[in-house]
């Protein structure tokens, strides 16, 4: 690991000008490429105190052993050079948007003497027009089959074409009029090229021109009483309309745009793009890539556009512009140098390109659709990855190795605290066994605090939750000692709950908190880890590993360590920790919202013994408000259906003002330690089982 100070340039050596820079490792390989409006300002930021840098940046500057730069004239030139270097050197610390599969395109080989329509994948070839990409090859074949009625362009391979030309007989498509058969001279090479140009124009979105022309031909044939020809043209029109219908009309005719969307977490980014040509979605593609750089959405968009449109720099259409660059590029966020990026795209296209965020109307609605697709793709990717047995096994092995554990963490417990300005504090405990969520083992805690009014902060709350969980585990483990050594008298924990041992004697199932975890994960950094470790130390628990995950998941904190442990971005172990932390956060938030919502809908009538929801509703319907109920006489309340004299007196007694009202916690719900949705436990147990799924 290199020391950045050993290769730090002197401030006076770095020019205060736009440019592109490269970090190299000791072997001379480029590990990172970046651009800057001011090289001096940007490069100086890499050589500040290591602890102030993002962990991923820390890893990059300590991997590198030298830095070099190139000054350019404008920021647009910097953008172009940065893309070229990323493509050339493939640096490991740069975000790379790579398709997870090769998407098929509808291709027309206009570079050949006799153009051919076909399905193509992989690298694009010079002189070939591409339309798409499509999600499936069969979708292209269906489209081509419909279009060949109107544009009977050659679709055969070179070998088939040459054999047909040598024999003087066309292939089957030539006999059924789905090929104009230039191989046997039915149509000249020039006329066939015009046919291929019309095919490309239709696919590029100029469908209205051809539909109007065919409608005129059909009307003319009908006027001449040539009904057979009119019927053929009618069928051609229907075929073209079916092709148009396959591409839903989403925007105004003539709209030429690519619509991008991102869905990201701390480790991965899901990208989706819809290609709109002539107001219709002509193609769609998406992929999920690793988030190897600490970039915001704007910077991610910049990297994305560079890699999507960069290859078009060497592909020029007949007018000198890149045919794959649309007039509009709609993105979810604008990068800092959006003006320069739009200028670069305009240079590629050969005409002005608009780069913007859609704000309203149909384009905004389409952008939301693309974003939904990106979110679903990311969720599907995570689900498939989580369900893979090999990946789970690798994750557990990596955690064992990286954390220095004696054995694989087959049981992982993660704890999170949720609160709103110090109120309704709740803690959650989620359990993963063998890399999978064990929802029947989840637990919820209502944080009490030393005075019963809640903890002062989340570190105190974390200490309380960890203490309560492991105190119960120790009590169950040592039930014989806790019961006086004889085992005949059941032990009780500090809440007065009977402890019968690790196995429930009535059901034969494992008791709550019966199993200790191999690894405890807390949501937070050093303060939360220290609080949890203090709780374990106070209880004498020394055989349970502990780590903390800060909000940025690559920061894995160990007790007593000054710096976090940085796991590789592609690590299955890090991915498992992310899932565990996210699940604990979701579970805590859900419990917190329920508890807060319940307190907001609480009625004074809830305190009346034996008064359920239906009888409360009957009272409120009869009197209109609690104030009027309090002012009523026992006889008036007893007159309400379902009430008697005794119940009426209980209602009035419960509603009578009490000196203790002023000290009652506003909105308090249930007994301490009782989770939402459950009646107050008469045993006062400190957590409740909330099975899910």
UniProtKB/Swiss-Prot annotation:
<dbReference type="InterPro" id="IPR050066">
    <property type="entry name" value="UvrABC_protein_C"/>
</dbReference>
<comment type="similarity">
    <text>Belongs to the UvrC family.</text>
</comment>
<dbReference type="GO" id="GO:0009432">
    <property type="term" value="P:SOS response"/>
</dbReference>
<dbReference type="Pfam" id="PF02151">
    <property type="entry name" value="UVR"/>
</dbReference>
<dbReference type="GO" id="GO:0009381">
    <property type="term" value="F:excinuclease ABC activity"/>
</dbReference>
<dbReference type="GO" id="GO:0006289">
    <property type="term" value="P:nucleotide-excision repair"/>
</dbReference>
<dbReference type="InterPro" id="IPR004791">
    <property type="entry name" value="UvrC"/>
</dbReference>
<dbReference type="InterPro" id="IPR035901">
    <property type="entry name" value="GIY-YIG_endonuc_sf"/>
</dbReference>
<dbReference type="InterPro" id="IPR001162">
    <property type="entry name" value="UvrC_RNase_H_dom"/>
</dbReference>
<keyword id="KW-0227">DNA damage</keyword>
<dbReference type="InterPro" id="IPR038476">
    <property type="entry name" value="UvrC_RNase_H_dom_sf"/>
</dbReference>
<dbReference type="InterPro" id="IPR003583">
    <property type="entry name" value="Hlx-hairpin-Hlx_DNA-bd_motif"/>
</dbReference>
<dbReference type="InterPro" id="IPR010994">
    <property type="entry name" value="RuvA_2-like"/>
</dbReference>
<dbReference type="GO" id="GO:0003677">
    <property type="term" value="F:DNA binding"/>
</dbReference>
<dbReference type="GO" id="GO:0009380">
    <property type="term" value="C:excinuclease repair complex"/>
</dbReference>
<keyword id="KW-0228">DNA excision</keyword>
<comment type="function">
    <text>The UvrABC repair system catalyzes the recognition and processing of DNA lesions. UvrC both incises the 5' and 3' sides of the lesion. The N-terminal half is responsible for the 3' incision and the C-terminal half is responsible for the 5' incision.</text>
</comment>
<dbReference type="GO" id="GO:0005737">
    <property type="term" value="C:cytoplasm"/>
</dbReference>
<dbReference type="Pfam" id="PF22920">
    <property type="entry name" value="UvrC_RNaseH"/>
</dbReference>
<feature type="compositionally biased region" description="Low complexity">
    <location>
        <begin position="672"/>
        <end position="693"/>
    </location>
</feature>
<keyword id="KW-0267">Excision nuclease</keyword>
<dbReference type="Pfam" id="PF08459">
    <property type="entry name" value="UvrC_RNaseH_dom"/>
</dbReference>
<protein>
    <recommendedName>
        <fullName>UvrABC system protein C</fullName>
    </recommendedName>
</protein>
<dbReference type="InterPro" id="IPR036876">
    <property type="entry name" value="UVR_dom_sf"/>
</dbReference>
<feature type="domain" description="UVR">
    <location>
        <begin position="208"/>
        <end position="243"/>
    </location>
</feature>
<keyword id="KW-0963">Cytoplasm</keyword>
<dbReference type="InterPro" id="IPR047296">
    <property type="entry name" value="GIY-YIG_UvrC_Cho"/>
</dbReference>
<keyword id="KW-0742">SOS response</keyword>
<comment type="subunit">
    <text>Interacts with UvrB in an incision complex.</text>
</comment>
<feature type="region of interest" description="Disordered">
    <location>
        <begin position="656"/>
        <end position="693"/>
    </location>
</feature>
<keyword id="KW-0234">DNA repair</keyword>
<dbReference type="Pfam" id="PF01541">
    <property type="entry name" value="GIY-YIG"/>
</dbReference>
<dbReference type="InterPro" id="IPR000305">
    <property type="entry name" value="GIY-YIG_endonuc"/>
</dbReference>
<dbReference type="Pfam" id="PF14520">
    <property type="entry name" value="HHH_5"/>
</dbReference>
<feature type="domain" description="GIY-YIG">
    <location>
        <begin position="16"/>
        <end position="95"/>
    </location>
</feature>
<dbReference type="InterPro" id="IPR001943">
    <property type="entry name" value="UVR_dom"/>
</dbReference>
